[in-house]
Amino acid sequence: MLITNPALLGILASLAPLALGAPNQSTQARSRKCVIPSSYTSSQGTADDSPAVAGAFAQCAENSVIIFQEGVDYNIFHPIKATNLSNVEIRVLGNLHLPQDITAVQNIVKSGQNTWFTFQGPRVDWTGADDINNGWINSYGQAWWDANPANSSSFPNRPHLMSYKTSQASIKNFRSRKPIAWNVKLHGDDITVTHAIVDAKSTGGFPFNTDGFDVEGTNISITDSVMYNGDDAIAVNTPSHNIVFARNTIGYQSHGMSIGSLGKDPTDFANITNLRFEDVTVIDALYAARFKSWSGGKGLVKNVVWKNIRVFNVTFPIFVTQSYSDQSASRSGTIDPSSSVMMEDFTWSNFSGSINTYHPGDGSCVTNPCWYNAGLPNLKHTEAIVLECNTESSCKNFRTEGIRLYPQSKDSPSVICMKATAELNPKLGFECKNGTFVPQ
């Protein structure tokens, strides 16, 4: 993508020292090469290539290139686990297929193998095909989504697609088609993700929990990517520092660019700093910019910016809750409702576009009231901004500017604001009360 906007170029240049994670900087050659054979064609798509794949990762675990051949299909009928990798490039030039037998996959997950691909080690790069027709992981999630029981949000024994723990690495052209549920759990330091595609658009049942990237680490960037799914496009979890999410398009029934959820376990102290979400287009989503923490949590999230965000038909463009709940999860132990994950130095700048007034929400609602409407007084679905601070001291130095968000009904945009005090938030940009949004 050629970027010519001088202002945007300046913004991205300013981000570089913060969080555009470093690509592979190893000086050691990848001298070994393992080309993975496939039995897909000879068996008319019935043979399992997992043993050959596992063998390649065992043989070429260090200083190597592991190649899924160009234009070749592979059946990955059993999970692949490679946790002793070092200085390896995984070159995915063909297409990978998970089993289409739901019961067989559920039995594997019940046995304790709940992640289909597990990669771990320093300098582990993923290089997908340049050809858009190749480099796909096909999970056949549509059948799972359609099989989900009515009024249920959690079909049992669904696998996570991938756990990726590395450092000084790059992921390029990662492509996931119809994931069963969670896509990539990305943990580590100095990682760049570019030109990823997550396609979880459904023709039937709702694609619950199809998160794009669940991120935890330092100096991680995700750029120039497209994610259409039914949960967070990115969810930043603790501990995380110096994260950039830029020049991306997200949508379908996405839950947007999220931080959290945090604080469900009050003994887990949240520690997140320096996040940038910039130049992102959000289409038909439930949320665009979102923060979610549980009441009773502890910790600090500091220095967060959402900037230059374009929204089209989004129900909640800007949303903060410090009293989050999950319709499919419960909590145990003693909870102090006056305790919060503290939020400090948050900026929402240059938001433009349309608020979903006529058909708000998404297909994830299985309760009454819907989980995303619970606790919101007099909801009109004209809200440009929702800020739910847990206490009068838990939100500090909030700032909004350039908010140009308008309901499709052509009513005036409104705001729901709780406990973001003027004393702690002198540059909030509007008066913290429920009603018409009037920028100051």
UniProtKB/Swiss-Prot annotation:
Active site residues of this protein: D231, H255
Keyword Manganese recorded: no
Matching Pfam families: Glyco_hydro_28 (PF00295)
Compartments (UniProt record): Secreted
A GO cellular-component term linked to this record: extracellular region
Record SUPFAM superfamilies: Pectin lyase-like
EC number: 3.2.1.67
Keyword Repeat belongs to the record: yes
Ranges of the PbH1 repeats in the UniProt entry: 217-238, 240-261, 272-293
Catalyses which reaction(s): [(1->4)-alpha-D-galacturonosyl](n) + H2O = alpha-D-galacturonate + [(1->4)-alpha-D-galacturonosyl](n-1)
GO molecular function terms noted in the UniProt entry: galacturan 1,4-alpha-galacturonidase activity; polygalacturonase activity
Disulfide bonds: C389-C395
A GO BP entry: pectin catabolic process
Signal peptide: 1-21
Residues listed as glycosylation sites in the UniProt record: N24, N84, N151, N219, N271, N313, N350, N434
Keyword annotations: Cell wall biogenesis/degradation, Disulfide bond, Glycoprotein, Glycosidase, Hydrolase, Repeat, Secreted, Signal
Highest taxon above the source species: Eukaryota
Function: Specific in hydrolyzing the terminal glycosidic bond of polygalacturonic acid and oligogalacturonates.
Protein family: Belongs to the glycosyl hydrolase 28 family.
Protein name: Probable exopolygalacturonase C
